[in-house]
């Protein structure tokens, strides 16, 4: 028998999908020939291999992309065409490929970012045509995509461009075509509120693009948006996202003690199997916990920028954000879940610059709500269940009953003050905390609302902060705006002392502030001397505190001459009797504070926007 002309080829060590060959053929081929239409038809019919595509692009430097820019331009142009074709699965595959490609290409380091990126994606001659087609295709898919899956993939592509090209002029094309109606309609139609995080993040990034340098139409859109149904959907999305973000902290360290059970008791002595108890989850080491906490919050935290934009620009949104409730849930309010997550964030804000920036944006948001008289009133009247972080000592007392939002906010500010003390103090963080407390106390005083709260914890924390500032004065005095922080802090304590009768719920709360001033008397004097507070704009307020402390200290010292040891009850009695001989000069302007001005925080807001861009890129891949 004659030998067959067919020969058996050796079996390859590994098989790879056909699309991987096309990736290499497209991006490693240096010739400038146009790929035939059949190539592109096959390319977008094949299911993308995101991992291989991403790795291939990672291996290319910016200069390599410029060398194959002709093929990159062809890819982008054809991907836009197929993404808008409405033909399945080519449209979905094209969007997936665009997501990977744009994320990788826009993350490269270019010598001339704007012009080089334009050269890679479209070419200088065709940039208007290509990008106008891109934004039109994305907007159409977001607003009227045939499936939610297509709509969300279009959002991801837009997020890639918005986050990757944030520092270039390319986002101008996104401001020329208004995506806001499409994004809001998509959010309204989504069944799962958690899915709305990406459209919301996209809206927030677009609203922050060059907003301090030029007119941004998304700013107006945020301010004018009044569709209550969609606003409620947005609030629910914020609620769900904040629950997810908070649960990531809890997964590292569960700060709610497990209730007693027979199974738990048997497990404690090694007999848990008898009660069918689940085996204990291994507890991470302290170093492991530190590393995990440093990674928090997750990338979904970029949505906090959008929350800020809505609260600052739109009073109707703020009212619904505070007043919306979710039926059938134990913790039933978007604002409660937002504040709950913030409380966890504040206890760990010092762990990374990213966490600090997100803490700042949430404090900007809370400050804006507190400054609005109607919202502040709601905060003082609305009572909801709210879980506050108890992951780090010192811990505030556990309150079994539901409390007002205002009381919870004060707790959060105290926690933030107590848990972020460092020699390299984040002065901006503390100015925001103390400023929010000053605004709340001012509102309570003027509205004569007697807020039920453990006020002694506030006095203790504020005066402990004074002691910290005194001990580390040499390290802290050179810090930028430290004097402004001290001025606000002293005014807050003095205002609480002089106006306490108008907002404290009982006489014991008022007595306690005098008691604490006596207790911290030596620290107050040292504090005044360390920061030269006997002169300047803070002098009058500081002198009141020192005078009150000295007045009661002298009375107590006089009694000690008669009685060897005084009990706390006897000291309190002396303080009450001392009111008759205490004279305090009225100090005007203690309740004065400036309304929030966004322009004063321009540099910080730009940094936060860049951080949100980085999180957006991490979110889509």
Task: Mark where each language-model region is.
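Long amphipathic alpha-helical scaffold regions
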Residues: 2-252
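Core helices of alpha-solenoid repeat scaffolds
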Residues: 16-19, 68-76, 123-135, 172-181, ...
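Short, flexible coil/linker elements and helix-boundary hinge sites characteristic
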Residues: 27-28, 270, 583
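Helix-loop junctions that connect tandem helical modules in alpha-solenoid scaffolds
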Residues: 29, 77-92, 136-149, 182-193, ...
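Residue-level detector of extended alpha-helical repeat arrays and alpha-solenoid scaffolds
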Residues: 91, 151, 196, 300-303, ...
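Alpha-helical repeat/alpha-solenoid scaffolds of the HEAT/ARM/MIF4G superfamily
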Residues: 107, 111-115, 167-392
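Eukaryotic scaffolding regions of large macromolecular assemblies
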Residues: 340-343, 350, 356-621
